[in-house]
């Protein structure tokens, strides 16, 4: 649970530490829930170039790494697409198989075009205006990363 956009961003930074090349993160949440804010934290931790904003109209922002031997970040907002077939028609499904980290806002709209082993994040509104509840689901075989992330959140490891 976070109490501010800054806290949501900080969770994104911690989350980046368990991501690997070719990871796909499917994000869901209502408009204004904090999906782009979370991506900003991931981008900061990955040390990529450019300001993070929602690619609502362009559908995809590719943030190249600012340093050698780092991963690019593929940031999608698929709200305007008509489903998995539209995602494939644009060739976006191929990007998820390239080296890099892929985060997809409104990812439930294109779930059928994604690999089975995606990490899922649902962001919902909490009991007050700034409170957000973040629920992560790691796929089978990645439980150890989910546990490491939980321990990071709890401050047990750094």
Mark where each language-model region is.
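Conserved nucleotide-sensing/catalytic segment adjacent to the nucleotide-binding pocket
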Residues: 52, 56, 62-106
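N-terminal pre-Walker A segment at the start of P-loop NTPase domains
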Residues: 1-14
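Phosphate-binding P-loop
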Residues: 16-22
């Amino acid at each position: 649970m976070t109490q501010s956009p800054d806290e949501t961003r900080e969770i994104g930074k911690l989350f980046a530490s368990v991501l690997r090349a070719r990871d796909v993160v499917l994000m869901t949440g209502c408009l204004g829930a904090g999906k782009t804010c979370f991506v900003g934290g991931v981008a900061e931790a990955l040390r990529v170039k450019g300001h993070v904003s929602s690619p609502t109209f362009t559908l995809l922002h590719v943030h190249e790494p600012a340093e050698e031997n780092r991963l690019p970040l593929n940031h999608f907002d698929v709200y305007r697409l008509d489903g998995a077939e539209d995602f494939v028609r644009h060739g976006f499904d191929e990007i998820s198989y390239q080296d890099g980290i892929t985060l997809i806002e409104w990812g439930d709209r294109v779930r059928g075009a994604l690999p089975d082993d995606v990490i899922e994040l649902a962001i919902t509104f909490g009991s007050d205006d700034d409170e957000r509840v973040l629920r992560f689901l790691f796929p089978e075989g990645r439980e150890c990363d989910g546990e490491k992330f939980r321990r990071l959140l709890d401050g047990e490891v750094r």
